[in-house]
């Protein structure tokens, strides 16, 4: 598995255990179970630092939760060691995103400007709100933050190659 950070995509966070046989609950960032099921190996990034490649034995959806079974983690005690860790896949293990869809990994760090050319800052985080994602944009120089809804009427264009997102802000969006 290529360990370069540009090739690795965080697809979820291990939120805890399920049962006593080492199954893990996964908070998926994408909701895409097929990519996980197709993966043979995953990379685990521990909260305290460091990574470890582990064979994925099974990925399933059960009672509204993603469940994983990893090689070598067959007891609840062993599985608890992974709580809070991020699950990473190689970009090649993921399907290409649809038109006008992007992996979070590709959006984080983009410069955000208005359609009138006003620089707002950098996408620092992406918040899941239920109806749509919200981009947390921060101008490090002024410490100002903006919450930009990820909706078609606001996001005018995204150019991953130039590292820029252009928005048409809703009235009052930038006044808060």
Curated annotation (Swiss-Prot):
GO biological process entries: ribosomal small subunit biogenesis; rRNA processing
Keywords: Chaperone, Cytoplasm, Ribosome biogenesis, rRNA processing
Subcellular location: Cytoplasm
Ranges for domain PRC barrel: 99-173
Pfam families registered for this protein in UniProt: PRC_RimM (PF24986), RimM (PF01782)
Gene3D superfamilies, A to Z: PRC-barrel domain, RimM
Subcellular location, principal: cytoplasm
UniProt GO cellular component terms: cytoplasm; ribosome
GO molecular function, one term: ribosome binding
Record carries keyword Repressor: no
InterPro entries: PRC_barrel-like_sf, PRC_RimM, RimM, RimM_N, RimM_N_sf, Transl_B-barrel_sf
Presence of the UniProt keyword Kinase in the record: no
Domain remark from Swiss-Prot or TrEMBL: The PRC barrel domain binds ribosomal protein uS19.
Role, per record: An accessory protein needed during the final step in the assembly of 30S ribosomal subunit, possibly for assembly of the head region. Essential for efficient processing of 16S rRNA. May be needed both before and after RbfA during the maturation of 16S rRNA. It has affinity for free ribosomal 30S subunits but not for 70S ribosomes.
Family statement drawn from the similarity comment of this UniProt entry: Belongs to the RimM family.
NCBIfam families assigned to the protein according to its UniProt record, in alphabetical order: 16S_RimM
Assembly behavior: Binds ribosomal protein uS19.
Protein name: Ribosome maturation factor RimM
């Amino acid at each position: 598995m290529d360990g370069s950070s540009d090739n690795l995509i965080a697809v979820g966070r291990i939120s805890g255990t399920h049962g006593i046989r080492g199954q893990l609950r996964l908070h998926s960032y994408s909701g895409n179970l097929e990519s996980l099921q197709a993966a043979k190996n995953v990379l685990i990034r521990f909260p305290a630092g460091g990574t470890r490649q582990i064979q994925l034995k099974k990925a399933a959806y059960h009672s509204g939760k993603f469940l994983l079974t990893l090689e070598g983690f067959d007891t609840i005690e062993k599985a608890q060691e992974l709580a809070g860790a991020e699950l990473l896949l190689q970009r090649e293990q993921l399907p290409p995103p649809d038109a006008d869809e992007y992996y979070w990994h590709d959006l984080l760090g983009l410069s955000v400007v208005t359609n009138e050319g006003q620089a707002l800052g950098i996408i620092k985080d992406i918040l899941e709100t239920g109806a749509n994602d919200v981009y947390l944009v921060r101008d490090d120089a002024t410490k100002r933050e903006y919450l930009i809804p990820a909706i078609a009427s606001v996001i005018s264009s995204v150019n991953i190659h130039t590292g820029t997102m252009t928005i048409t802000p809703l009235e009052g969006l930038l006044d808060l």
